[in-house]
């Protein structure tokens, strides 16, 4: 049974994680409540952080205050903390408290913009992994010109062996079935070429395993130049390559969006033309590729819902990370993945 407060889904928030915290977190919670809550779903927040910084914000953002419970934690995980240091020395941090809320059943999931390595280390220590999962991976849903796809790993595992890549493909396929509603997801390994001989030992080894796996619809290698075509449902990479690919794509999208706006709206004449002919269609395309609405990434394989928002997330980005958490909980994602894993086993 999901933790609830007055029948609301409960989300724990690490209010001190991220470049613009706690303002981005409290504003983000408010933006979510005002704009992103689906009909019929009610959400309540457990907020953890420094009272001196957060209390004035809760007074200002009354809707958040009215739909939350706040607990003071003066310690927080810093951006440059190594995972091992955070695990040993940030025991009274807002991040750890939010994760423990999930472990203790006070919340159904948590969201943080904090240090990725620390968040993974603390989450794995407190929550553990799902049955038969060796290493969790970070997964996010990315847009293409045709459809969305799941990309993993995005930084949890910089170096991956053959077995890890194989399991990421398996978990990614399950994630796509549940989150993307794809019956038989097509899975590909990210590589520097499509020939079987290309890539490092881990990638080539994973290729051999996936090629013979009866429960994965494996389509071989995919190059970075092809991922926006929308022909694949799941793309698998080690955490180093996946993270670089995602951030490069997001930076490109942001730059492209800014350039379009700059060129389209640099005079009253073009403003009029765009307004008359292109505004609705242009906005639809720009929103589809806007990184802010794709901010959330899930730590897939943990025994609990943990969502990572970008460290530089603003209120809108953080709000969409909250929405990702709520959707994952509402879909009962982890229990469905456990069921899928058991069927494979």
UniProtKB/Swiss-Prot annotation:
Pathway participation: Lipid metabolism; phospholipid metabolism
Molecular function terms, GO-annotated: phosphate:acyl-[acyl carrier protein] acyltransferase activity
Main location per the UniProt record: cytoplasm
InterPro entries named in the record: FA_synthesis, Phospholipid_synth_PlsX-like
GO cellular component: cytoplasm
Keyword Hydrolase: no
Pfam family, one: FA_synthesis
HAMAP family: PlsX
Function: Catalyzes the reversible formation of acyl-phosphate (acyl-PO(4)) from acyl-[acyl-carrier-protein] (acyl-ACP). This enzyme utilizes acyl-ACP as fatty acyl donor, but not acyl-CoA.
Name listed for the protein in its UniProt record: Phosphate acyltransferase
Organism: Wolbachia sp. subsp. Brugia malayi (strain TRS)
Taxonomic lineage of the native organism: Bacteria, Pseudomonadati, Pseudomonadota, Alphaproteobacteria, Rickettsiales
